[in-house]
């Protein structure tokens, strides 16, 4: 009996996984159903699902307790560990194994949070997103504020002057759709020069209010998305390309289309029929979406397009465009101030009022926008690192491999390969 067991083990150990006999397929199916089960306890958890409808119906009907879900996920992780120890895998299968392991570990982390377990901001971001954003002292932001202070005209506090300066660049509500449509069309045109997308891909845009976010891509499967834009607060002219590229081309819409096309439809990997928001996938999704606007619209080219097309459409004088972007370039360096507000607040080191004031002082938010951001932090917690830290990781990954602004073909190739791959944050360093 021992001899037979040993022979079977050696046969298993020498196996190289093929597409039709991949033991991870059953784990992937169970993973999808457990993500759907968590979604019954957390309305924000399942960002997209386009797998078998009966799995969704089953999750609703059963409403598994969180303890049962956690136990089932632990079992899947044990099975994955066994596969890793006994099965010889090629590079693609190794990446799939790592991806499933990290995604399942993030499910456990989210379940622990839902069960009331406390983690620090950095512990949570590592457990959910596979990354920890750098920490900056208040002095870092004070230095940046001093650099910005001399650039912004007017009198009074910098935050007040910054708000007043930007008022001249607000898109009038009655021109918003025309400006966004133009930005989306140009982002699509540029993306399709380098990315092969299915002919039926498309998305629709809706304008909404009362949300904690500025825009959201709801991927529906079948190569289609719904993009919602929050018009509750003023939208500035620079946000047209930001949102068109981030939510659409080559951002979230393209990312999801490529995953569905290359990994679900081609490879039949069912784990890509669901997208759990609080997972390592999100750092790549948000980071690539933020960096995507730079890939599609390099700085000088973006300014030219905006001055010639978007500014006139919005009825904004393009004469002030250079100054506007000079100010925004410096202000963008304050991005990590939002992380510090979230980290301090969620770790109990800042009161809500102090965190909100921090956003006003160091992110230069209006009181209304700071309040909206606080609601985002309370809803999505350490998710905030995925935008700036994620973008920095993606930028460094692409550019360190030759994908620089002076080599757009190479930049697009590396960027698109990343969108279609299984790489997570720890694999970008």
Where in this protein do the model-derived segments appear?
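N-terminal maturation segment of proteins
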Residues: 19-429
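Hydrophobic h-region of N-terminal signal peptides that target proteins for export
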Residues: 9-18
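Sec-dependent signal peptide recognition
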Residues: 1-8
């Amino acid at each position: 009996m021992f001899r037979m067991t040993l022979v079977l083990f050696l046969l298993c150990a020498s196996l190289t996984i093929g597409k039709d006999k991949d033991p991870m397929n059953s784990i992937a199916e169970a993973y999808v159903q457990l993500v759907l089960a968590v979604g019954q306890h957390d309305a924000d958890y399942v960002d997209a699902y386009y797998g078998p409808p009966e799995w969704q119906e089953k999750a609703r009907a059963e409403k598994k307790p969180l303890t049962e879900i956690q136990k089932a996920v632990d079992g899947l992780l044990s099975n994955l560990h066994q596969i890793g120890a006994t099965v010889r895998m090629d590079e693609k299968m190794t990446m799939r194994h790592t991806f499933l392991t990290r995604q399942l570990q993030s499910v456990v982390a989210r379940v622990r949070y839902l069960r009331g377990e406390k983690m620090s901001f950095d512990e949570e971001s590592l457990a959910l997103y596979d990354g920890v954003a750098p920490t900056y002292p208040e002095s870092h932001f004070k230095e940046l504020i001093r650099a910005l202070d001399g650039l912004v005209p007017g009198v009074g506090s910098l935050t007040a002057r910054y708000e007043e300066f930007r008022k001249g660049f607000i898109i009038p509500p009655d021109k918003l759709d025309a400006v966004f449509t133009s930005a989306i069309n140009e982002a699509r045109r540029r993306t399709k020069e380098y990315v092969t997308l299915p002919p039926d891909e498309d998305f629709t845009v809706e304008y909404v209010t009362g949300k904690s976010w500025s825009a959201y891509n709801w991927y529906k499967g079948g190569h289609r998305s719904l993009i919602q834009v929050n018009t509750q607060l003023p939208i500035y002219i620079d946000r047209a390309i930001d949102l068109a590229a981030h939510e659409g081309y080559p951002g979230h819409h393209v990312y999801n289309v490529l995953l569905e096309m290359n990994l679900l439809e081609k490879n039949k990997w069912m784990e890509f029929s669901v997208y759990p928001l609080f997972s390592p996938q999100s750092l790549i999704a948000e980071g690539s979406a933020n960096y995507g606007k730079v890939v599609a619209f390099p700085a000088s080219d973006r300014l030219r397009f905006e001055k010639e097309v978007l500014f006139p459409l919005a009825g904004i004088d393009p004469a002030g465009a250079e100054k506007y972007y000079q100010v925004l370039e410096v202000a963008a360096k304050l991005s990590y101030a939002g992380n510090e507000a979230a980290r301090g607040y969620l770790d109990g080191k800042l009161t809500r009022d102090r965190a909100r004031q921090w956003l006003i002082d160091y992110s230069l938010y209006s009181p209304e926008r700071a309040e909206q951001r606080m609601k985002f932090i309370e809803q999505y917690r350490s998710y905030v690192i995925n935008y700036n830290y994620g973008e920095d990781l993606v930028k460094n990954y692409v550019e360190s491999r030759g994908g620089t602004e002076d080599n757009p073909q190479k930049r697009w190739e590396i960027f698109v390969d990343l969108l279609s791959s299984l790489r997570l944050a720890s694999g970008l360093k």
